[in-house]
Amino acid sequence: MLAVEVSEAEGGIREWEEEEKEEEAAERTPTGEKSPNSPRTLLSLRGKARTGGPMEVKLELHPLQNRWALWFFKNDRSRAWQDNLHLVTKVDTVEDFWALYSHIQLASKLSSGCDYALFKDGIQPMWEDSRNKRGGRWLVSLAKQQRHIELDRLWLETLLCLIGESFEEHSREVCGAVVNIRTKGDKIAVWTREAENQAGVLHVGRVYKERLGLSPKTIIGYQAHADTATKSNSLAKNKFVV
């Protein structure tokens, strides 16, 4: 049944070119070893996850710090909201993540009204979850024309920020991320668990904005779930901005 429900989330993915060798040096630790969850390492392991290497060689798995669950939402107004939300699978290694990403449809190919959500195992992608209700989200709103230009890159970078624990000690504040495919314009949001943790929230926002490669002139805002739950998205006020 689930396979039928989420069939829209299946599909292919384009190839990614390798970075220049000099960029690799920036990802190494002071001891000269490459950080296991650095952006370049995560990308370089993608090919291995897809090919598996020679049959006689056992693939070395690279565990993630957290287990992550991918959810798929397809809007059907005849059903309750929670009945439209489906757990696709869970991943806890870099190789599992790339295998999953390579076999689901790109966000830009989803129909309007659909969402992907990647959350830490045990946290559901809804405001009502006890680990979300005191938190909020950093929201990136895209113009309609950006769907086929920037959406997939921004969403993948968001996923890599999550599984790579890119926010250092403040990564523990991160609950997950959601991409909403909408007719008026798509949205990507990173959810954190405590809206009142100003230092943690701002650190996540600054790092996230930098990782997305957004212009310094581009402003993204953080909204508390308590505010957005009682108001429309357009009326919700930003608690913080970066």
Curated annotation (Swiss-Prot):
Belongs to the eukaryotic initiation factor 4E family. PROSITE patterns: IF4E (PS00813). GO terms for cellular component: eukaryotic translation initiation factor 4F complex. This is Eukaryotic translation initiation factor 4E type 1B. Residues 32-41 have a biased composition (Polar residues). eIF4F is a multi-subunit complex, the composition of which varies with external and internal environmental conditions. It is composed of at least EIF4A, EIF4E and EIF4G. GO terms for biological process: regulation of translation; translational initiation. The keyword Protein biosynthesis applies. Keywords: Initiation factor, Protein biosynthesis, RNA-binding, Translation regulation. One of its GO terms (molecular function) is translation initiation factor activity. InterPro entries: TIF_eIF4e-like, TIF_eIF_4E, TIF_eIF_4E_CS. It comes from the Eukaryota. Coiled coil: none annotated.
